[in-house]
Amino acid sequence: MKMQKGNVLLMFGLLLHLEAATNSNETSTSANTGSSVISSGASTATNSGSSVTSSGVSTATISGSSVTSNGVSIVTNSEFHTTSSGISTATNSEFSTVSSGISIATNSESSTTSSGASTATNSESSTPSSGASTATNSDSSTTSSGASTATNSDSSTTSSEASTATNSESSTTSSGASTATNSESSTVSSRASTATNSESSTTSSGASTATNSESRTTSNGAGTATNSESSTTSSGASTATNSESSTPSSGAGTATNSESSTTSSGAGTATNSESSTVSSGISTVTNSESSTPSSGANTATNSESSTTSSGANTATNSDSSTTSSGASTATNSESSTTSSGASTATNSESSTTSSGASTATNSGSSTTSSGTSTATNSESSTVSSGASTATTSESSTTSSGASTATNSESSTVSSGASTATNSESSTTSSGANTATNSGSSVTSAGSGTAALTGMHTTSHSASTAVSEAKPGGSLVPWEIFLITLVSVVAAVGLFAGLFFCVRNSLSLRNTFNTAVYHPHGLNHGLGPGPGGNHGAPHRPRWSPNWFWRRPVSSIAMEMSGRNSGP
């Protein structure tokens, strides 16, 4: 039996039907339980399918889903972990989301923080909004305001444009249409979403159709889930078949052999789904583990996670695809996110574009915000309000400026131009930045040039750092190569010039001698004359021309001998 996924916010509807599993202002401890719900108290759930805590402390270990609101939550090896207005710590969890609080995710697949601090270590995706984020060895992704096209990228996210993700691990689109195929997670906001064979599909403010997806949730619309792990519908009718749990609230619901299906004031149909949630929208989920649409149209087929909010999303076999108020197309993508922009991600793990154009090919992460981005074979590329070109770079971020990153691990530019080549980390804010093979370069309101630097920071000034964190006097490999190349070219040019100069000068001298000393006959050597040899054979003297195999003619030598005689 699969662990539940997707019962994040609307699982509180279970309080109306599962009073036996509910504690108010008390402490609850559940082991190997299908569902555990606590309101205003402490909860400890171990190996449970779902654990929900409101205004209290929750600790979930190896649980399918753990949700905490206005409290502290600690989740270990959990599939889903969400915390609102509190502190969250997730270890080895697939999803960790924190809103208005602090989140620490270690080895988690996805970690999202809104209006708070986030620390992600070895996490597949970490996205902070309006807060501080520290990500180490994270796969990640995030972009705003532009069009994105990601191909074979690790993560693709697009905001305020259309997004198309193919074979990407996660695809997310906001304010546009999204189409995700074979992606791990697909999320669409404020448009229609179609997810096929995706791990998770979520749609807000629209219709959703999910097939063979692990988790599907729809808000403000009708939902139909088939063979999905979790199906939840709010504000509509729900029909769940072969699902583990089905709970409808203020609507019609039909659940058959379903693990979990919740419907609240909406229409939902779930068949063989583990978790499917629909809230005030239309959702159709088939064989999906988790799919959530909210106020939009979403179609997810065999998708693990697909989310659509007020936009169109089509996810097929995608792990994660998210679209919000934009168009997104994700195919076999692990993560692709588009928000109010156009995004095309193909086989990309993470690609993010917001209100700009982005093209990512085989990139781990590509993010574009209000600008144009082109990422090829890059793990992470982020552009915000500027143009970015990333090639085989792990992370490249540009905000309101132009960025060109090549084979760089991390490059970030904000309101300036950035060129990063083979650099581990390069960050520029309101200035120009050029980082080459640098470990870390940060520039704020100024221009910075970093080459192979361990750490370079500039604030409101111009800075140039070369080979920081390296022994004094050491040169960058490309500098050594350039110097050597220039030296070789100069030496070859010098020798070639000398050769031709000497050769031309000797050739002109020989021609001059032949023209001046004109021959006077064939028998000139036998006639009398001053300095003559009177018929004796004349041995020509040594001449520099012999060095060039241009011997002086005998006539010229004889004339020279006559002139030199008494």
Curated annotation (Swiss-Prot):
Subcellular location, principal: membrane
**Gene Ontology annotations for the cellular component aspect, listed alphabetically:** Golgi lumen; plasma membrane
Q: Which InterPro entries match?
A: Mucin_dom (IPR028199), Tandem-repeating_mucin (IPR008519)
**Which residues, if any, are the signal sequence?**
1-24
- Could you tell me the membrane topology recorded for this protein? Single-pass type I membrane protein
Residues on the membrane's Extracellular side span: 25-479
Alphabetically sorted, this entry's keywords are:
Cell membrane, Glycoprotein, Membrane, Repeat, Signal, Transmembrane, Transmembrane helix
Covalent S-S links between cysteines: none
Keyword Signal applies: yes
**UniProt miscellaneous comment:** Could be considered as a marker for lung carcinomas.
This chain belongs to the protein called Mucin-21
Q: What species was this sequence derived from?
A: Homo sapiens
